[in-house]
Amino acid sequence: MTAWVGLTGGIGSGKSAAAQYFADLGVPRIDADAAAHSLTASDGIALPEIRRLFGDTVFDTQGLLRRDILRKEIFASPSRKALLESVMLPLIFSEIKKQQETFTDAVYGIVEIPLLTEKRQFISLIRRVLTISAPLEKRIGRVMARSGLTRGEVADIISHQASESERLLLADDVLLNDGSLKSLREKTMLLHAFYSGIFASKPTQGKHNG
């Protein structure tokens, strides 16, 4: 039975880079954001309900979801955000579970869930939580460099996410990503050895009993 580690962290923490390093080591990787994207891609199963709830204005003439418009709408309205989540979260949960069932021989796998702290229902899918942590200024700088967003825009996004202390309270394990990519890779390799050891001997190891 494959044990699953939930990998999470705030924007700019380096969680996707860490998840990729695990994958490079042969660890099964499931990405909640990628699952969400597939559900809302052309002919995605979430589209009919999104159209029913949000109307035609969030779709283009080809029937494709206008993600930028939908993003602005839910960012401006907590109730609209909750409405979208009522559609998406159960579908994402089911998709992750379906993907997990395709891996039966691996000792452990990684599920990258950015909003794990905010959406605790996903904890039932995992055994341990790995939080990728980084100093605030480094996070802001990384996001600005890759996105072109202003400092204020990045800070606004961070303010709408769970706090670092909330993520750390949920964590079984913490990886501090305060250096280079080489350092991050080395820390990931150490965690890989740790997880391979504990899950080989005790597949249910961890305070989260997914």
Curated annotation (Swiss-Prot):
Enzyme class, broadest EC rank: transferase
Q: Where is the DPCK domain?
A: 4-202
Family that this chain belongs to: Belongs to the CoaE family.
Native species of this protein? Answer: Neisseria gonorrhoeae (strain ATCC 700825 / FA 1090)
InterPro entries given for it?
Answer: Depp_CoAkinase, P-loop_NTPase
Source taxonomy: Bacteria, Pseudomonadati, Pseudomonadota, Betaproteobacteria, Neisseriales
Pfam families per the UniProt record, alphabetical: CoaE (PF01121)
Name of the molecule in the record: Dephospho-CoA kinase
Q: Which GO terms describe its cellular component?
A: cytoplasm
